[in-house]
């Protein structure tokens, strides 16, 4: 049977549990039509490059599928009907990767770096340096700056 990689984007206002339930539904569709899901990766909520159906973020999931084309067509038909699915893309591949995808490897690498530094991801704040400042540093006392005009008058 042909092998496919399928990426699914679900609305951000559905819970992770609801996304898993949706994937279980699509897994059932694949299995009813003679296929099987080899691997499921939940990439979590990520920002989108641009708004899709008024959403700035979405739940991302990767499905590795071994199924006949009719099963993929039925799954995609049901995804088009669902209001919770923003986008999806199915690509036929020669072989499925058994190792974690690049997104999962990146997440593991980032988590490992943060643990080595002794902080978590969400502690960073603006600028990524742990505070509000960027790369400018303190400019010190700038002294008396005198009167400034703001245009319009005189």
Swiss-Prot record:
Residues 105-124, 135-154 have a biased composition (Basic and acidic residues). Keywords: Ribonucleoprotein, Ribosomal protein, RNA-binding, rRNA-binding. InterPro entries: Ribosomal_bS6, Ribosomal_bS6_sf, Ribosomal_S6_plastid/chlpt, Transl_elong_EF1B/ribsomal_bS6. The keyword Ribonucleoprotein applies. One of its GO terms (molecular function) is small ribosomal subunit rRNA binding. One of its GO terms (cellular component) is cytosolic small ribosomal subunit. It comes from the Bacteria. GO terms for biological process: translation. Residues 97-154 are annotated as: Disordered. Coiled coil: none annotated. Belongs to the bacterial ribosomal protein bS6 family. Binds together with bS18 to 16S ribosomal RNA. This is Small ribosomal subunit protein bS6. The lineage of its organism: Bacteria, Pseudomonadati, Pseudomonadota, Alphaproteobacteria, Hyphomicrobiales. The gene is rpsF.
